[in-house]
């Protein structure tokens, strides 16, 4: 059985993961509205991944006979300036999630909850990959640019990432 504090912290993380899913759905819709179908498809798929992260936490709480408390998820941002703005915000959000996961890991070590510490290692690895992915997309958009054919090329680049991740 997990401590009440650990249950509370993991429930808060579920909420953060669900917010991320909604944020990426909002960003996906913005991309589709702006004819950026590659980025729209990528972010739509990524929203599903974020939801899966929350479900993984829910499963862990269920397996440890702990109470899952789904909380209200705040409304995500819906207005973006550009494709670069969208992906800079995804990168910033992933950094926020990484910080949150690291805080959880530190708490588990401090309180000698080695089972939950071990469980969270998957998230540590996942966040490393997520930050690298989004940083790479931001860098590529900056390199290609968003003027003229650049926006189309950036969208195609992101589309190719989405297609390669399906395999």
Swiss-Prot record:
GO terms assigned for molecular function: ferric iron binding; ferrous iron binding; ferroxidase activity
Span of the signal peptide: none
Binding annotation for Fe cation 2: 50, 94, 127
Record localization: Cytoplasm
UniProt keywords, alphabetically: Cytoplasm, Iron, Iron storage, Metal-binding, Oxidoreductase
One biological process term in Gene Ontology: iron ion transport
Cited InterPro entries: Ferritin (IPR001519), Ferritin-like (IPR012347), Ferritin-like_diiron (IPR009040), Ferritin-like_SF (IPR009078), Ferritin_DPS_dom (IPR008331), Ferritin_prok (IPR041719)
Catalytic activity, EC: 1.16.3.2
Catalytic activity: 4 Fe(2+) + O2 + 6 H2O = 4 iron(III) oxide-hydroxide + 12 H(+)
Pfam families reported for this sequence: Ferritin
Residues engaged in binding Fe cation 1: 17, 50, 53
Residues annotated as domain Ferritin-like diiron: 1-145
CDD domains recorded: Nonheme_Ferritin
Keyword Lipid biosynthesis carried by entry: no
Gene3D superfamilies reported for this sequence: 1.20.1260.10
GO cellular component, one term: cytosol
Major site of localization recorded for this protein: cytoplasm
Biological role: Iron-storage protein.
Assigned protein family: Belongs to the ferritin family. Prokaryotic subfamily.
UniProt subunit comment: Homooligomer of 24 subunits that assemble into a spherical protein shell (12 +/- 1 nM diameter) that can sequester at least 2000 iron atoms.
UniProt cross-references to PANTHER family, sorted A to Z: BACTERIAL NON-HEME FERRITIN, FERRITIN
Name of the protein this chain belongs to: Bacterial non-heme ferritin
UniProt lineage: Bacteria, Pseudomonadati, Campylobacterota, Epsilonproteobacteria, Campylobacterales
Gene: ftn
